[in-house]
Each structure stands twice: as structure tokens, then as C-alpha cells.
A protein has these predicted regions:
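C-terminal domain-closing interface element
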Residues: 9-16, 150-179
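Conserved hydrophobic/aromatic pocket- or pore-lining residues that grip, position, or stack substrates
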Residues: 11, 48, 72
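Cytochrome P450 heme-binding "Cys pocket" and the immediately downstream C-terminal segment
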Residues: 90, 107-161
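C-terminal, well-structured subdomains that either form a transmembrane helix-short loop-helix hairpin
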Residues: 41-58, 93-118
Length: 179
């Protein structure tokens, strides 16, 4: 199961459920970094101002995830990632479920539920590519307020007439039985 854990982490890294997030400052504060030309100077945020952060872009930072940060490579979670070299990036460099006191309360449940679903599908059905795909299956990238693929990638069991499984980040997993 360690590899499944790595696969799920990598999927959530590349396609976070909420790719862009915003917060409103309730009081004037100074952030320790984000100012100046190189982003290393303090930055003042006034009361009432909105601060947006892009998890989608952060999860593709080469300084945290290596030179292949834009590629799907689950094995990266088994390595000594740059992400874990200091406490701040280890805590705030991977945010598919947000972080701090506003982190998703259901993240552990969601992770276990996703792992269970993937395992049960793989145990029960041999998955093959549909005839329409000749090479690698490439999904269409989509970025909005919620990460989803408008067109699901269709995967079919060997006995196509009995079952079709459509995987789509936007709609969850739909299973259609029958012909």
C-alpha cells in the first residue's frame, strides 16, 4: 500500500481539489516573505485586503519538488524531497487539503476512502485501454475554482459489454453496468 499512498499524494499534488484559495485579512499584518523583487522581503497586508494563493502553481515549484515538478512521478514521495528540508516548506509546501487551523477536517477520511475505492476497482476488474486510444492516454488539463477534467478518461474492463468505468476528477467515479 505504500505505492498507492504515493500515487494518491502525487495526484493531489498535480490536481489539488481547490487549486486557488483566498483569505481576507481581519487586521493589518506583516507577512515574513512575499515582498521585494525576489519575494524574500516582508510584505504588509492591510485589514480587509484579500490575499490569494495558488496551490496549483506551488505544487509545481521546482525548488520544492525537483526539476520534474510538472511530471506525474509518484516515486518522488519515497525520496528526500527538497520540500522536507525545512519546517516551513514541509508544513506549507503541500496543501491539497489546505493547512493550519483551516485544514480540511475530512482529509484523512477522504484519503482512506480514495485508497479503498482504487484498491477495490483494481481487485475486481482488469483495466485495459479502450480501442479508441492507440498511444498514451493524455487527459485535458483544466484549471478553475475546482480541479476537474470536463471530459473523463474512459477506462474499460476486458468484458466491455458488461461494464464501463468512467474516471473524472469533476464527477467522481461513475460506474455504468450493462450494455
Amino acid at each position: 500500500m505504500p505505492y498507492l499512498d504515493q500515487v494518491l499524494r502525487e495526484v493531489l499534488r498535480l490536481y489539488p481539489p481547490v487549486p486557488v484559495n483566498t483569505r481576507t485579512a481581519h487586521k493589518t499584518t506583516i507577512l515574513p516573505t512575499g515582498g521585494g523583487k525576489d519575494g524574500t522581503k516582508p510584505f504588509m497586508v492591510r485589514e480587509g485586503e484579500n490575499v490569494a494563493f495558488c496551490v496549483y502553481a506551488m505544487h509545481r515549484r521546482e525548488d520544492l519538488y525537483g526539476p520534474d515538478a510538472g511530471q506525474f512521478r509518484p516515486e518522488r514521495w519515497d525520496e528526500d524531497l527538497l520540500l522536507f528540508q525545512n519546517e516551513r516548506t514541509a508544513t506549507w509546501g503541500y496543501l491539497p487539503f489546505n493547512g493550519g487551523p483551516r485544514a480540511c477536517l475530512g482529509q484523512d477520511f477522504g484519503f482512506v476512502e480514495a485508497a479503498y475505492t482504487v484498491v477495490r476497482i483494481l481487485q475486481k476488474y482488469p483495466i485495459v485501454k479502450p480501442d479508441m486510444y492507440k498511444g498514451d492516454i493524455q487527459g485535458r488539463k483544466w484549471l478553475g475554482w475546482s480541479s476537474h477534467q470536463p471530459e473523463g478518461i474512459e477506462m474499460v474492463t476486458e468484458e466491455r459489454q458488461k461494464m464501463t468505468i468512467v474516471l473524472s476528477l469533476g464527477d467522481g467515479c461513475r460506474v455504468t453496468l450493462g450494455r
